[in-house]
Amino acid sequence: MPTFTSNDAQINYQTFGDATKPALIFSNSLGTNFKMWQAQIDFFQQDFFVICYDTRGHGASSAPQGPYSIDQLGQDVVNLLDHLNVEKAAFCGISMGGLTGQWLAIHRPERFNQVVVCNTAAKIGQEQAWNDRAALVREQGLQPIASTAASRWFTEPFI
């Protein structure tokens, strides 16, 4: 998979479809990689130049020493567009990717035709809760948070 350098991170990305068509970039949620968008990639690549990337610290992208900021994640997207010589794109982000999309819409609107934010908020959780969750994963792996993650994403009848 191709990578490029954005500030201090190696960002993994992949493109699908014809680069002469309108660009559409997908941004993953916390704890996932760009493959979460596979159904959308398959559908949209006929009509769009689809760009997917792993947010820094996720998937095959590097995880330089943090902390990370939404400003930094947004700039990674702009740097990716620059790397691919894409002037303007549509953007779709979910959860953490949606936070990135909000930053892009506010700070770099000239680079985006549309910004779609899914399952996100202006602020998600408190800093200490995220720090505690990260420490738990570092110490014990993903298993301790797996069941609580499923309950946040799906209703009881679905699980």
Give the residues covered by each predicted segment.
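Structured helix-beta-strand junction loops
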Residues: Q46-D47, E87, Q140
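Short acidic-hydrophobic surface loop/beta-edge motif
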Residues: P2-S6
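Conserved HGGG/HGGXW glycine-rich cap/lid loop of the alpha/beta-hydrolase fold
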Residues: N7-G66
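Conserved alpha/beta-hydrolase catalytic His-Asp/Glu region
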Residues: G125-A129, E139-I159
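Conserved acidic catalytic loop of the alpha/beta-hydrolase fold
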Residues: D71-A89
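Alpha/beta-hydrolase-fold catalytic nucleophile elbow
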Residues: D54, C118-N119, R152
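Short, well-ordered alpha-helices that flank and scaffold nucleotide-derived cofactor binding pockets
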Residues: A39-D42, Q46, N79, I106-E110, ...
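Conserved hydrolase catalytic core segment
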Residues: H83-Q126
